[in-house]
């Protein structure tokens, strides 16, 4: 093993009596002189028979140099292998030069001593200094500029041609040194990456000292060291190969030592483990099994106790919660009963008091007067008045806050309001984009602005400004804010121009009037289509469409199924255990409930029969015809004729047979007259003949 020697700057081996040693001479590990000696280890046997490495009495290698000491100024200049040092501050150049002189003297003495002894075990590399005077003395790594690359050249080796390098900048790039995983493999002869070279400048007046000498802190000294390193790099290519070989060999040697130490530790650990396993007995396994069983039983017991504790806690908590809910329910029920009792008692007290004081008749008169049409008409006029609407707007805007009045909210989704708005700009943009596809002629500007149709110009202007601030593309960064602003601008153009606003109001009034007329016409038409004329009361009865198909329209109690029906079939069905009779008929391909018409006609039909008892004819009987008559397709329905006659004020007598269109054949206008003859059986006068005539076919 190797360790630092306290008296030398490099690495020294163990004691000369034994142990492996690696020694380098000089104040630092210099690539010029390297020495190796044999490796020798000793081993001994432990009391248990295991062979292991024994320690020597001489100092042993403990660890590679601590990198923390390289930056600690209290330990002096670092010696031995270490990382390449960064560029030193100019203020420390003088101290470095003094230390370099001492290191050079020690190096000369050591080299001279070993040359005198004639030791041939050292590998000597001749100096490349070409000076005639002083022989080449390798400089320490902490000399000028701490540049170890110039250790093989003296300061006399500076060629005049190096001055030309001052005008070049970045011509030759510095090569990075070999990097090894271990810090011990780094030697002072490594090339450190030099910073970017700068042009040489003439020293200023403040850079010189008294007597004309140059300030040693000036950066020119470091540039001189870099110039020498560049010259060494270009001239000593052969020497660099030897240095790299030495570095690689030293790094491999340290790697081998670390590998041997690691393998020895693992072998020793495995030996202890094997020895411990050999000492085990059969009883130890039994004890281990018993120990595992005991701990397994303990863990199982703890798990059971924990499970029981959790289950009991859960059950207890659930019971408490249910009891609490029952208690709350009982309290609420009690409070409700007390409230109802108090209300009933109070109402009885008020009624008795009013009876004694005679207020009951007055209260009845007041309530009847409030429910009168006159009071309702007065309330409607008050609500439609402009002062009342202004008061409502003031309350809704928040100018007059009342605790029982809610603040104004959006009428449609997120529609803006004239004041007190809490809508977000994104919501307003989304609302306006829903109306982007509406044409401008059909656009409702009041809905876009979020105001009433009766809003004043001031309200419209205020609403437009508020929306413009939220929707404008310069204020809102929504990708479709421009489209929303176009919709808002179109609405504002309509209401801001008096002529366009008047035109829009006239158009809206016409549309409202037209829609009202159309709605009335459709409602009357729907009513007419869902009514039947009655010849007995000369009125109309409603009919209701049923959700039944003609193929399964009639219910038969004998077959317990539904039978198909034909056009004009008239039958009855019972429900509610026979207490309710409902009459049905198939007209225009649909099943209708005509119970009102049948009740007015006083038709008596047995319900749930297998055969159709009666048939409704929609056309008058022609002479010489009998049986069922079908309505002619050219004649319009009787209900539509009556409806059109009422609209156009045409008296029924002017229509031929009640037909407004004067059809050549007897139209269905005679349905009302023929219905009693066709539906009401003549059993009252001639019951037998009527049955034979009306039931000629079997169902």
UniProtKB/Swiss-Prot annotation:
Matching CDD domains: DnaJ (cd06257)
- Report any one BP term from Gene Ontology: protein transport
Stated membrane topology is: Multi-pass membrane protein
The source's superkingdom equals Eukaryota
Q: Where is the J domain?
A: 444-508
Q: Where is the composition biased (Basic residues)?
A: 219-228, 687-699
The record's keywords, sorted A to Z, are:
Chaperone, Endoplasmic reticulum, Host-virus interaction, Membrane, Protein transport, Transmembrane, Transmembrane helix, Transport
Q: Does the keyword Chloroplast apply?
A: no
What does the UniProt entry say about where the protein is found? Answer: Endoplasmic reticulum membrane
Which residue ranges have biased composition labelled Acidic residues? Answer: 86-102, 163-176
InterPro entries this protein is in?
A: DnaJ_domain, J_dom_sf, Jiv, Viral_replicn-host_int_reg
| Listed PANTHER family | DNAJ HOMOLOG SUBFAMILY C MEMBER 14 (PTHR44665:SF1)
As for what it does, the entry says: Regulates the export of target proteins, such as DRD1, from the endoplasmic reticulum to the cell surface. Promotes cleavage of pestivirus polyprotein.
Q: What is this protein called?
A: DnaJ homolog subfamily C member 14
Native species of this protein?
Bos taurus
Q: Which gene does this sequence derive from?
A: DNAJC14
């Amino acid at each position: 093993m190797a360790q630092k020697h306290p008296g030398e700057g490099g690495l020294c081996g163990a004691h000369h009596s034994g142990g492996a040693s690696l020694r380098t001479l000089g104040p630092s590990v210099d690539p010029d002189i390297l020495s190796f000696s044999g490796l020798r280890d000793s081993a001994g046997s432990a009391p248990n028979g295991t062979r292991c490495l024994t320690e020597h009495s001489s100092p042993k290698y403990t660890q590679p140099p601590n990198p923390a000491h390289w930056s600690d100024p209290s330990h002096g200049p670092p010696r031995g292998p270490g990382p390449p040092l960064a560029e030193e501050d100019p203020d420390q150049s003088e101290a470095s030069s003094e230390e370099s002189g001492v290191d050079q003297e020690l190096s000369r003495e050591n080299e001279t001593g070993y040359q005198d002894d004639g030791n041939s075990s050292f590998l000597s590399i001749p100096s490349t200094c070409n000076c005639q005077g002083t022989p080449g003395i390798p400089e320490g790594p902490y000399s000028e500029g701490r540049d170890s690359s110039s250790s093989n050249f003296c300061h006399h080796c500076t060629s005049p041609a190096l001055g030309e390098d001052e005008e070049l900048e970045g011509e030759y790039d510095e090569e990075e040194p070999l990097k090894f995983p271990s810090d011990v493999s780094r030697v002072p002869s490594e090339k450190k990456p030099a910073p970017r070279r700068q042009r040489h400048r003439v020293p200023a007046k403040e850079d010189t000292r008294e007597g004309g000498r140059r300030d040693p802190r000036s950066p020119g000294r470091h540039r001189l060291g870099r110039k020498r390193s560049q010259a060494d790099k270009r001239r000593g290519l052969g020497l660099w190969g030897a240095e790299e070989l030495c570095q690689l060999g030293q790094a491999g040697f340290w790697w081998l030592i670390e590998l041997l130490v690691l393998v020895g530790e693992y072998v020793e650990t495995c030996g202890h483990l094997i020895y411990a396993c050999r000492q085990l007995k059969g009883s130890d396994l039994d004890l281990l099994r018993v120990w595992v069983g005991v701990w397994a039983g303990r863990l199982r017991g703890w798990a059971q106790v924990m499970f029981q504790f959790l289950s009991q806690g859960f059950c207890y908590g659930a019971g408490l919660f249910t009891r609490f809910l029952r208690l709350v329910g009982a309290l609420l029920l009690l409070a409700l009963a007390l409230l109802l009792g108090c209300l009933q008692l109070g109402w009885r007290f008020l009624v008795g008091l009013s009876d004694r004081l005679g207020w009951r008749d007055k209260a009845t008169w007041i309530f009847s007067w409030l429910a009168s049409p006159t009071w309702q008409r007065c309330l409607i006029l008050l609500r439609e008045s402009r002062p009342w609407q202004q008061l409502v707007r003031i309350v809704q805007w928040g100018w007059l806050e009342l605790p029982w009045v809610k603040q104004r909210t959006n009428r449609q989704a997120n529609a803006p309001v004239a004041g007190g708005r809490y809508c977000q700009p994104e919501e307003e943009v989304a609302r306006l984009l829903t109306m982007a596809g509406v044409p401008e002629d059909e656009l409702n500007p009041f809905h876009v602005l979020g105001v009433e149709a009766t809003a004043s110009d001031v309200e419209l202007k205020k609403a437009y400004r508020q929306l413009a601030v939220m929707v404008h593309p310069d204020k809102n960064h929504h990708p479709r804010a421009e489209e929303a602003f176009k919709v808002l601008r179109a609405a504002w153009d309509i209401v801001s121009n008096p002529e366009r606003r008047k035109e829009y109001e006239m158009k809206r009034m016409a549309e409202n009037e037209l829609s009202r007329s159309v709605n009335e016409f459709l409602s009357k038409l729907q009513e007419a289509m869902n009514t039947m004329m009655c010849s007995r009361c000369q009125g109309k009865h409603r009919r209701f469409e049923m959700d039944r198909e003609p193929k399964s329209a009639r219910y038969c109690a004998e077959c317990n199924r539904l039978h198909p029906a034909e056009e004009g079939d008239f039958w009855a069905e019972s429900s509610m255990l026979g207490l309710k009779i409902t009459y049905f008929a198939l007209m225009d391909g649909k099943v209708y409930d005509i119970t009102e018409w049948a009740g007015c006609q006083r038709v008596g039909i047995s319900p749930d029969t297998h055969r159709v008892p009666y048939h409704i004819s929609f056309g008058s009987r022609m002479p010489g015809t009998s049986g069922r008559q079908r309505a002619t397709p050219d004649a319009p329905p009787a209900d539509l004729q009556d409806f059109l006659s009422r609209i156009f004020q045409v008296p029924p007598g002017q229509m031929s047979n009640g037909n407004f269109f004067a059809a050549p054949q007897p139209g269905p206008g005679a349905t009302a007259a023929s219905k009693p003859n066709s539906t009401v059986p003549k059993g009252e006068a001639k019951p037998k003949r009527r049955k034979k005539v009306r039931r000629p076919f079997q169902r």
